[in-house]
From Swiss-Prot:
InterPro entries: Fumarate_red_C, SQR/QFR_C/D. It holds the Pfam family Fumarate_red_C. Keywords: Cell inner membrane, Cell membrane, Membrane, Transmembrane, Transmembrane helix. It comes from Citrobacter koseri (strain ATCC BAA-895 / CDC 4225-83 / SGSC4696). One of its GO terms (molecular function) is succinate dehydrogenase activity. Belongs to the FrdC family. The gene is frdC. This is Fumarate reductase subunit C. Two distinct, membrane-bound, FAD-containing enzymes are responsible for the catalysis of fumarate and succinate interconversion; fumarate reductase is used in anaerobic growth, and succinate dehydrogenase is used in aerobic growth. Anchors the catalytic components of the fumarate reductase complex to the cell inner membrane, binds quinones. The chain crosses the membrane at residues 30-50, 57-77, 109-129. It is a multi-pass membrane protein. Part of an enzyme complex containing four subunits: a flavoprotein (FrdA), an iron-sulfur protein (FrdB), and two hydrophobic anchor proteins (FrdC and FrdD). It comes from the Bacteria. One of its GO terms (cellular component) is fumarate reductase complex. NCBIfam families: PRK04987.1.
Amino acid sequence: MTTKRKAYVRPMTSTWWKKLPFYRFYMLREGTAVPAVWFSIELIFGLFALKHGAESWMGFVGFLQNPVVVILNLIALAAALLHTKTWFELAPKAANIIVKDEKMGPEPIIKGLWVVTAVVTVVILYVALYW
């Protein structure tokens, strides 16, 4: 059976997500993919420069010293930290850890993830700078 009535279509503006802070933050978090793409492409170019010898590598290092590239990399770092923070806050919701018949709160898990991140970062920096 078909009807001749026109279905109600709720109007939706292209800026619907700007009305609530939750959606604005969601769009910001999803937007962290763009700086991640920038950094991935930059890393691939760096690997190719490393493959093609010292002169190519020095050209890449010169490219990295450009102030615009430094600013883009700082933006990429901030985006990566925001993305990491949101994932670390999501992790306790995905894992139900029970200790002594009580569900563990999210704080120890989040703090543990940040500690692991800091330790791995320090180890990588040590290996890169002093090994």
